[in-house]
């Protein structure tokens, strides 16, 4: 049983992938909460409840924005590590999501300093549905990746 750089990459990826799974689950829960608050706060009769709901929506979007850069940077780190370890199959599996993250990062609104998840935009039914589907797809990808990294870590530790 030899400890190689590839085994280290898989171990670190396994731990960080657990964090990405947590991020994806948090996104799903947040979008589900936004879906329950889908009615426009202006439509409500009581202005106190409307302001309270609007603050809740802004708080959720603020927290979602805080998770975007760590998620993108962790996934970029995966790709750099697997490139350095010359794990081509694993790199090939991660590159499509990395390109999607780059596309998403560079196509955010130019006038906002935040990355995404602006409250009025997210509360659009189509955007909210898209974001929720994206979160479910990322959760599936990260779960499959987790078990793939676990298998590859064991394989590299045993085969070396």
UniProtKB/Swiss-Prot annotation:
Which InterPro entries does the entry link to?
Cornichon, Cornichon_conserved
- CC per GO annotation: AMPA glutamate receptor complex; dendrite; dendritic shaft; glutamatergic synapse; postsynaptic membrane; synapse
Q: Where in the cell is it found?
A: Postsynaptic cell membrane
Where would you find the membrane-spanning parts of this chain?
A: 11-31, 73-93, 139-159
Side of membrane Cytoplasmic, spans: 1-10, 94-138
Q: In which tissues is it expressed?
A: Brain. Expressed in the neocortex, hippocampal formation, and cerebellum (at protein level).
**Pfam families under this entry?**
Cornichon
Q: What is its main location?
A: membrane
Any ranges marked Lumenal in the topology annotation, and which? 32-72, 160
What is this entry's stated membrane topology? Multi-pass membrane protein
PANTHER family tied to this protein:
CORNICHON-RELATED
So what does this one do? Answer: Regulates the trafficking and gating properties of AMPA-selective glutamate receptors (AMPARs). Promotes their targeting to the cell membrane and synapses and modulates their gating properties by regulating their rates of activation, deactivation and desensitization.
Subunit info here reads: Acts as an auxiliary subunit for AMPA-selective glutamate receptors (AMPARs). Found in a complex with GRIA1, GRIA2, GRIA3, GRIA4, CNIH2, CACNG2, CACNG3, CACNG4, CACNG5, CACNG7 and CACNG8.
Family statement: Belongs to the cornichon family.
Q: What name has this protein been given in UniProt?
A: Protein cornichon homolog 3
Natural source organism: Rattus norvegicus (Rat)
């Amino acid at each position: 049983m030899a400890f190689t750089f590839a085994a280290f990459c898989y171990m670190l990826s396994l731990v960080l992938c657990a964090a990405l799974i947590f991020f994806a689950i948090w996104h799903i829960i947040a979008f589900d909460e936004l879906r329950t608050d889908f009615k426009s706060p202006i439509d409500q009769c009581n202005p106190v409840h409307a302001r309270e709901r609007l603050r809740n929506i802004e708080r959720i979007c603020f927290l979602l924005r805080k998770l975007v850069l760590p998620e993108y940077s962790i996934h970029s780190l995966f790709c750099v590590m697997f490139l350095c370890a010359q794990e081509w199959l694993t790199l090939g599996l991660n590159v499509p999501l990395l390109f999607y993250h780059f596309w998403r990062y560079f196509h955010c609104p130019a006038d906002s300093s935040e990355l995404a998840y602006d409250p009025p935009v997210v509360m659009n039914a189509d955007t909210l549905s898209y974001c929720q589907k994206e979160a479910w797809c990322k959760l599936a990808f990260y779960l499959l990746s987790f078990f793939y990294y676990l298998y590859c870590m064991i394989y590299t530790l045993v085969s070396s």
